[in-house]
Amino acid sequence: MVRHSKNILPKTTNPNPESNRYPPHPADPSHPSRYHLHLQAHHLRSPLLSASAENRRRDPQNLSTTKATSPSTHQSPILPDDIHSILPFAHMNITHTTGQHTENSIRAPSSTTILWHSCQLHSQPSSISSSTKIVSGRVLFSDSSPCSSNPHTQQPSIFSCPTLAGRKLESSGSIFLSTTLPSFIVSIVYLLSVSCRLVPGQTAFTNTNSSVLIDIPILLCSVGSLSLILKEPKYRSYLAIVSPTLSC
């Protein structure tokens, strides 16, 4: 009777036994090969850089503490340097100052006009507002404008908004959507957010200082525009300019 002996594997001597108990984390910067492979497989699924991942990159020692205290918590990996080729808007600085909205806003109606006439969208009046949102959303968050914020850039910005987008439009409905309707909405939103208090039981007109002299003409222009644009279409351009000017 032959007894089969068990194959006993030789024990390997490891100078660092802790490495066998705790294998390297796939997102550990101390292991470049595993680290980059993990990023290539995971950065498309997690395109946002979390604050914890940023802290781990700055302080590698904090990684071991995080694993020891909360091993089940998943941390977002650090984005690679070539993320700009994947996300075209990743280079945009979202933290921006409102002082640059004035000079940046003049580029929005100009770009809308070029897009409107180059793509021949005259048969679709509703596309004016859509194209304006697309262009202005990109322009207002761009801080690369060489212009400086000064009062002289406010007037061209205000006048260009109603005139450039509707200068060569032939349809009366298109002019209404591009000039009169936006100016009416801007004035009403300004009055409701700044000058009025819409709390149940406490509805009131809150402005009591000198700015009330501006709020009253804004309200009159908004109410008067509803009747004038129906009887006298030639006054549409004037109302579209006066109302946003008072709001600014």
Swiss-Prot record:
It comes from Encephalitozoon cuniculi (strain GB-M1). Residues 10-19, 61-76 have a biased composition (Polar residues). InterPro entries: UPF0328. Residues 1-34, 51-81 are annotated as: Disordered. It holds the Pfam family DUF2463. It comes from the Eukaryota. Belongs to the UPF0328 family. This is UPF0328 protein ECU06_0030/ECU06_1690/ECU11_0020.
